[in-house]
């Protein structure tokens, strides 16, 4: 960092009411500074962070105060010693300058490579020495967060682990046969392969036991083995829960039940682009954390007057920050689940997560969905306009799609054909394409 840039940073800090999350201030007059937590948090933070010494932190809403550094050489020795106690060791970049006659010292902490995360204090070990930056606080990482890094680095596939308490008789053979026929039609099966070997190759069986993927997609009752691998749905009015339900079933069934719950609870649901909500639900169910550390956690669906919120356990997998999400530039957690659902036709291959949701909402003239990551959870918000503020295109387009869905459920093939003949071409296509 250039000295002039550091001086500008100090001046902006002294005037700012709120400081960025990647900045930590220290009164260097303290005889001993324990920096292990903030060093770990900054090294794990996207883009790293800056430790600024000689500026006291704001208190009770008051601006930060310039206090200066008396012995910069001794301070750098203290910082270097603590950086060497981290794993992997941290190599800070120092910059000194004078502001209003007082010396300040900045230590830039680089973000470590994702393959080496999490950075932690060696003396206490990873379970207690790995920290993350939450706002301007340093918080210990949970076991699930640490496992997420390990799973990414070692390419651990939690969806392929065997379910020890289950038997293959607990799997619905009809669903598996449908999947096998789809594979055969795609020329992915070779003649002469043993049945059990084939199931193992496709990630459905390990040593005679069904895998988690088999349980989630083909079991008669997945929640009998993993009760919390469900959706907890609730409707709120004036901040109070009006209705709460637990939704059970396989992943595709969970998604459809959740969509029905939304349509039933929201008077305006027929006018909302439900394909975007379906994409968010599928992402939450497929790419949530299915590790042993998250077996007690469900996916949550909350509906209020102002928004629909879908909350799933697990942070971004393989994504350094939120900026890589919209274009789908991230690794995938549980890729076998996605592959099977795509093969079965339950997950359109052309959809690309966040970008698809944004495009769908924009086409309907509605606010883009919002994603927030907090405390190892991923929250997706769909903001609902007031009932008198819905764009006309959203009303018409979703109404046409809903008509198509209704006719398909009623097996009204002939009626659907006749309706499409009299509708304008664009509207007829929306009815015919509704899934």
Identify the residue ranges that each predicted region occupies.
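Glycine-rich/acidic phosphate-handling loop/turn and adjacent ATP-lid/helix
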Residues: 306-345, 388-406
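Short amphipathic alpha-helical interface segments
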Residues: 398-426
């Amino acid at each position: 960092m250039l000295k002039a840039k550091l001086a500008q940073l100090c001046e902006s800090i002294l005037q700012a009411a709120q400081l960025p999350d990647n900045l930590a201030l220290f009164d260097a007059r303290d005889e001993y500074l324990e920096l292990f937590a903030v060093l770990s948090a900054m090294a794990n933070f996207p883009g790293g962070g800056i430790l600024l010494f000689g500026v006291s932190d704001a208190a009770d809403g008051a601006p930060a105060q310039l206090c200066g550094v008396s012995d910069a050489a001794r301070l750098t020795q203290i910082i270097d010693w603590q950086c060497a106690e981290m794993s992997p060791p941290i190599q800070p970049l120092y910059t000194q300058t004078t502001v209003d006659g007082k010396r300040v010292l900045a230590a830039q902490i680089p973000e470590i490579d994702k393959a080496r995360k999490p950075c932690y204090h060696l003396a206490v070990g990873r379970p207690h020495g790995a920290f993350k930056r939450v706002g301007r606080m340093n918080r210990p990482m949970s076991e699930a967060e640490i496992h997420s890094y390990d799973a990414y680095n070692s390419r651990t596939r939690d969806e392929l682990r065997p379910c020890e308490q289950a038997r293959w008789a607990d799997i619905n053979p009809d669903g598996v046969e449908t999947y096998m026929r789809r594979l055969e039609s795609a020329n992915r099966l070779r003649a002469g392969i043993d049945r059990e070997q084939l199931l193992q190759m496709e990630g459905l069986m390990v040593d005679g036991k069904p895998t988690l993927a088999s349980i989630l997609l083909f079991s008669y009752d997945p929640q009998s083995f993993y009760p919390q691998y469900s959706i907890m749905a609730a409707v709120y009015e004036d901040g109070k829960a009006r209705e709460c339900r637990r939704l059970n079933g396989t992943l595709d069934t969970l998604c459809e039940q959740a969509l029905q719950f939304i349509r039933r609870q929201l008077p305006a649901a027929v006018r909302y682009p439900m394909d975007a909500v379906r994409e968010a639900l599928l992402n939450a169910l497929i790419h949530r954390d299915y590790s042993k550390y998250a077996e007690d956690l469900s996916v949550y669906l909350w509906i209020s007057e102002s928004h629909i919120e879908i909350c799933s356990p697990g942070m971004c997998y393989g994504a350094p920050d939120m900026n890589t999400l919209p274009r789908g530039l991230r690794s995938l957690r549980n890729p076998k689940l996605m592959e099977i659902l795509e093969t079965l036709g339950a997950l359109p291959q052309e959809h690309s997560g966040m970008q698809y949701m944004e495009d769908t909402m924009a086409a309907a003239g509605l606010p883009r969905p919002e994603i927030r990551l907090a405390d190892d959870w991923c929250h997706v918000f769909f903001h609902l306009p007031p009932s008198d503020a819905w764009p006309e295109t959203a009303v018409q387009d979703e109404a046409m799609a809903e008509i198509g869905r209704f006719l398909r459920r009623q097996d009204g093939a002939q009626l659907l054909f006749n309706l499409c003949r009299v509708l304008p071409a664009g509207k007829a296509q929306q009815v015919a394409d509704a899934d």
